[in-house]
UniProtKB/Swiss-Prot annotation:
Gene: pyrB
Record bears the keyword Chloroplast: no
Protein family according to the UniProt entry: Belongs to the aspartate/ornithine carbamoyltransferase superfamily. ATCase family.
Name of the protein in its database record: Aspartate carbamoyltransferase catalytic subunit
MF terms in GO: amino acid binding; aspartate carbamoyltransferase activity
Biological or metabolic pathway of the protein: Pyrimidine metabolism; UMP biosynthesis via de novo pathway; (S)-dihydroorotate from bicarbonate: step 2/3
Record lineage: Bacteria, Pseudomonadati, Pseudomonadota, Alphaproteobacteria, Hyphomicrobiales
InterPro entries named among the record's database cross-references: Asp/Orn_carbamoyltranf_P-bd, Asp/Orn_carbamoylTrfase, Asp/Orn_carbamoylTrfase_sf, Asp_carbamoyltransf, Asp_carbamoyltransf_Asp/Orn-bd
Subunit text: Heterododecamer (2C3:3R2) of six catalytic PyrB chains organized as two trimers (C3), and six regulatory PyrI chains organized as three dimers (R2).
Annotated source species: Rhizobium etli (strain CIAT 652)
GO cellular component, one term: cytosol
Length: 318
């Protein structure tokens, strides 16, 4: 039997191909549960999950909540807007307070990179990173991988083009790490101003043209233009950005006929993607949302149940 040797899920970095495959296989089982009429199980009955979101979220928070509830856990959503954080309490103080309540897992989203890793050092329960600044978003990468694997039957040797605001995207970073670990060919397509320095050292091919970057791609993953994280003029205008880097039906023709169109959400229609593509036959955006619940069920079960059946480490380095 294969064991998952980690107490926390802080990032994709630190996971092996075997770890990733284990979680994806678990998630496949969770998909079956989610498609049943009776979706609730007793797997995590008696265990407590606290969702601690310091950044606004709709999909991710709802997905984690639903995952916990479908496994039978007691789930609490902590509203940061009404919490002691607004009164000046630090993240560490909040962590220590919550830890004293003896939860079994904390799910955290925070605007600062490294927040999840810091939390994991201060609490005695498992920690799941739901996105920390521009660092990582591991469950998003896992759900994207599950979506691709279920549609294509594999992850190795497929060509994935990640397009758009790579610079500010924790989703891009986690996907690059995961896809490389699983043997995929990864391309990034973006203007130079929206690419981090040293991106080529992450094992990706860099393109500045959508036509060139999408050629023969099996998967096209569009990223949102994250204007809320921008402090300067990274693009001349939204209109010009869409002209050169937006995905419409004509641009999509450069990819394979059976290419998958993906987007982590929320989408900016008419900015990075056209409605005709987002709602078109090649889009698997709705499937990504469904796979998100399954992946988070798999992560929760693995950290809180499966890991107790074998040796584990104290966590992963972010």
């Amino acid at each position: 039997m294969v064991f998952f040797p980690h107490r926390h899920l802080i990032g994709i970095k630190g996971l092996t191909e075997q770890d990733i495959t284990y979680l994806l296989d678990k998630a496949d089982e969770a998909v079956k549960i989610s498609r049943q009429r009776e979706k609730k199980t007793s797997t995590l009955r008696g265990l407590t999950q606290i969702n601690l979101f310091f950044e606004a979220s709709t999909r991710t928070q709802a997905s984690f909540e639903l995952a916990g509830k479908r496994l039978g856990a007691d789930v609490m959503n902590m509203s940061v807007g009404n919490s002691s954080v607004k009164k000046g309490e630090t993240l560490i103080d909040t962590a220590m307070t919550l830890n004293a309540m003896r939860p079994d897992v904390l799910v955290i989203r925070h605007s600062s990179a490294g927040a999840a890793a810091l939390l994991a050092q201060k609490v005695s329960c498992s920690v799941v990173n739901a996105g920390d600044g521009q660092h990582e978003h591991p469950t998003q990468a896992l759900l994207d991988a599950l979506t691709i694997r279920r549609a294509k039957g594999k992850l190795s040797r497929i060509i994935v083009a990640i397009c758009g605001d790579v610079l500010h995207s924790r989703v891009a970073r986690s996907n690059i790490l995961l896809l490389n670990a699983m043997g995929a060919r990864v391309r990034v397509v973006a203007p130079a101003t929206l690419l981090p320095s040293g991106i080529a050292e992450m094992g990706v091919e860099v393109f500045h043209s959508m036509q060139e970057g999408l050629k023969d791609a099996d998967v096209v993953m569009m990223l949102r233009l994250q204007r809320e994280r921008m402090s300067g003029a990274f693009v001349p205008s939204v209109r010009e950005y869409y002209h050169f880097y937006g995905l419409d039906a004509e641009t999509l023709k450069a990819a394979k006929e059976d290419t998958l169109v993906m987007h982590p959400g929320p989408m900016n229609r008419g900015v990075e993607i056209a409605s005709e593509v987002a709602d078109g036959p090649q889009s698997v955006i709705a499937e990504q949302v469904e796979m998100g619940v399954a992946v988070r069920m798999a992560v929760m079960e693995t950290l809180l149940v499966s890991q107790n059946q074998g040796p584990r480490t104290d966590g992963m380095k972010a």
